[in-house]
Amino acid sequence: MTQTTIDYATRARLGALMPSGNTVAEPELRAMLPAGVGLFVTRLPLTGSSEAELLAMLETLETGTKLLADAQPDAIAFHCTAVSTFAPHMAGEIRARMGRASPIPALATADAILAALAALHATRVLLVTPYIEPVHQREIAWLTASGFQVTGGGCMGVATNAEMARIPPEAIRDRVLAEAAKNPADVCFISCTAIRSAGLIAPLEAALGIPVITSNQVLAWHALRRLGIADTPPGFGRLFATPVSIKDAA
C-alpha cells in the first residue's frame, strides 16, 4: 500500500497574521519555505487601503496573536507591508502588542524589509508598489526615515487586495523595467504582500543586474533566518544566497 507523504512541519512552524482579503501571500510564502517548515495563518480584517482601513486591521491584533499562539508556532509574523510601514514606530508598536499577548517571538514585514536591505548593503532603493498614492508616499517616508534613499519608482493606484491580486505579473515587470531605466539604485523593492511578484525576482535580477526583493520574499527569508534555518530555495533571488548571521537577521 502506498502511503501519501504529508509535510507536518517537523522542523519549524511559522505563524502569520495576514489581511483578510489577501490571496497571494500564502501561496508565495509556501513556495519559498523549505520542506519541514509549515505556515499557519490567522486573518485580520483588511480589504482596502484607506488610512482608516489600514489602522483598523490592528484592532484585533491581540486576538489574532492569541489564536495563532494556540498552534504553538516558533514565531509569529505580522505580515502587511502597508500597515507595518505606516510610520517609523509602527512595527515596534505591533511587536510590543503581540509580545504582551503571547511570549512567542514576533516580527513584522517592516522588520524583514530592513533586515534584507541591510544584508544586501543597499542604500539606494527603487520602490515599485501597487498602492494608491498616499500609501506609496508613506512607504517612501518610512524608508527615508530608516536611512535609505528612494531614487525613484512609482505606484499603480490600486486600492483593494482583490484588485492587487489581479494585476498581471507582466504589468509589474514592465513597470519595474521602465522605472529602473530612469532611476539607478542598489536594489529594487517590489512592495506589497498581495501582488504576484515572486516569479519575477530571478528574471528581473538577470535583467537589471541588481538584487530584487519583494514583501513575501523578505518575510520568508527573515523568518527562516530568525528560526535558525539557512536553506536557500532556488529561484527566489540573491537575498536567500546572501551570507548573514542569525544575530544579524534578528
Tell me what each language-model feature is:
Residues 94, 98-161, 240-248:
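Conserved beta-alpha
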Residues 58-71, 171-185:
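Short, well-structured alpha-helical segments in soluble
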Residues 82-87, 160-166, 196:
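Short, small-residue-enriched loops and turns at beta-alpha junctions
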Residues 158-163, 212-232:
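Short, flexible loop segments at boundaries between secondary-structure elements
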Residues 1-63, 134-168:
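N-terminal glycine-rich anion-binding loop in soluble enzyme alpha/beta folds
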Residues 174, 178-207, 219-220:
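Hydrophobic alpha-helical
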Residues 65-111:
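Glycine/small-residue-rich loop that forms an oxyanion/phosphate-binding "nest" at active or ligand-binding sites
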Residues 74-79, 126-127, 185-192:
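Periplasmic-binding protein-like
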